[in-house]
Design a protein with these regions (language model features):
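The conserved 3'-phosphoadenosine-5'-phosphosulfate
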Residues: 33-44, 109-112, 118, 122-177
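PAPS-dependent sulfotransferase catalytic domain
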Residues: 1-108, 114-122
């Protein structure tokens, strides 16, 4: 079975998948050293998927969902691909937008619909066969050690080596404001 991260645009889902995939040596992900090198040398690398795991590519039906992999997508993309995903995905992590996001790139841009849709409760109702976990947007854009602590004990745990990668990503976010 594979994992899925559901997130709203500009909410760090690709970066989170890069870290989780590398930490857990998932089949469709690069290793941490390769990702770190890309993050340091390509200003856009930390804002995109580093390999084939964007669920939007499923629409073309050319990408097959593999076991021991991680995929990412926005809610509408996941919904549109439900028939192809339902039996291949087990664990889902949603980046939760339910509370007011404080210091993130999406500040003042989160819509009411997003704040209601990107929650653990909503995703559990929409996709009842999946094990759903959540992390709040502010926690993702915060301290790497706290992020690791929050994800420990879930199927989305992070390796200690992700701290440096997360700090590179946060610096890029802050420098782009």
């Amino acid at each position: 079975m594979s994992k899925l991260i559901i997130f709203a645009p500009q909410c760090g889902g690709n970066h989170l998948a890069n870290m989780i995939g590398a930490s857990q040596n998932l089949d469709n992900c690069l290793n941490l050293q390769e990702i770190e090198l890309a993050y340091q040398n390509d200003k856009n690398a930390s804002h995109t998927h580093m390999n084939e795991f964007f669920i939007n590519e499923m629409i073309s039906y050319t990408v097959t969902i593999k076991n021991n992999s991680i995929y990412v997508g926005h809610l509408d993309e996941v919904w549109n691909n439900w028939d192809r995903l339902k039996d291949k995905i087990k664990d889902v992590l949603v980046i939760d937008l339910s509370k007011k996001a404080q210091e993130t790139i999406r500040k003042n841009k989160i819509t009411y619909l997003e704040s209601c849709s990107y929650t653990k409760e909503f995703i559990e109702k929409l996709f009842p066969n999946w094990n759903v976990e959540s992390i709040h947007l502010d926690d993702l854009f915060g301290n790497a050690d706290m992020l690791k602590f929050i994800l420990d004990g879930t199927s989305f745990s992070l390796d200690n080596r992700c701290v440096k990668l997360h700090n590179i990503w946060l610096k890029k976010i802050k420098d782009s404001k």
